[in-house]
Amino acid sequence: MLILALQHVLAMFGATILVPILVNEIAGCEVLTIPVALFTSGLGTLIYILCTKGKSPVYLGSSFAFISPIAYAYLAGGKSGVGLGIFAVGLIYVIVAILIKIFGHDWIHKLIPPVVIGPMIMVIGLGLAPTAISEIGINGGDLNLKYLIVAIVSFIVTAITATRAKGFLKIIPFLIGIVSGYVLSIILGLVDFTSIQKESYFSIPKFILPFKDYALSLKGILTIAPIALVTIAEHLGDHMALSTIIKKDLIKDPGLDKTLLGDGIATSVAGLLGGPANTTYGENTSVVGMTKVASVKVIGLAAIIAIIISFFGKIIGVLATIPSPVLGGISLLLYGFIAVNGLKVIVQNQIDFDDVKNVIVVSTMLVLGLGGAIISIITKNTNIQISGMSLAAIIGIILNLILSNTKKETNK
């Protein structure tokens, strides 16, 4: 079970640490730290497992949807603005969870039906594709042959293991692919061990203690909190995708109210401790899908490992030495798998594309989500930037509500 859990840790590690790195780059200073991001990721996952009574094999990691809002919230209201804004996001999740508990979840299904969820999941996966391409180094710049070789080997080893291996090896294809790519990277001289030397053996993450270090920042809250409406849709989409994979309706059992409650409390706790907002991780969902191991115990152990790692700088340093082409090769499979799950939602719900309304909703979401569309809402107090998946989700929901079906048959 330990090896299975390590596979999930490696799957989430790159994206989880990338969020604080990107936020800090945009803000021009340290807003978030990697150890706190790892700690709140693991703690948040355990909170989620507790709230869902151990019935949903979901891992929570740092959300990409909040990268720009967090950076702008920091510029508007400092770390207090960031922390309280993320706390407010979690609070919105909890409120929606309570409403679902009282009134049921039919209303949210009408608001966000499969015709919206399917392309939303596709945008999540395909929207991450440029990251994988960039990690490999085949995005139009000077080609590094060593990078390309490492990425190809990592990809092929993972794909062959997933499709041809037998027994225990078949359920750890990503771990085998990463190890193979890492060893080859060492042989080719692509691994830089200086990051390990710089890290201390043991250090306590730089937490921001609840209610002690905070000052009320309305600007920060208004910059971050509105994104919750988008990530709730992402939450629903991810759980529908996982339901398809494990052949169990997670929306009914443990229930959308419990999954949102777990995600919400986890996000609020992350905000109060100085971590990024949490979200259900498609990378780990892909691992579940390809390995066919949907064990909550494995996810829980991965969360505990993430918490432990956050206190040991040397371990973080070792994981940070994994070259980008290794992660890029693996990500080709991970992100593609996410996109295909979106397609499966459309197919399994028998979305009728003879109905022009459905064509308009899906096509508009795909173009906006993958076309680099960005809308900035700038006022005296806020600077909200909506782009990619977030923008596609909002427009998809609006179009689905205002357009009429052109055929008598409705989507299932």
Task: Specify the residue positions occupied by each region the protein language model found.
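Intrinsically disordered, low-complexity non-transmembrane regions of multi-pass membrane transporters
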Residues: 1-4, 193-208, 244-251, 258-259, ...
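Membrane-embedded helical hairpins/re-entrant loop segments and their flanking transmembrane helices
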Residues: 24-47, 225-296
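Interfacial segments of multi-pass membrane proteins
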Residues: 69-75, 162, 284-299, 305-310
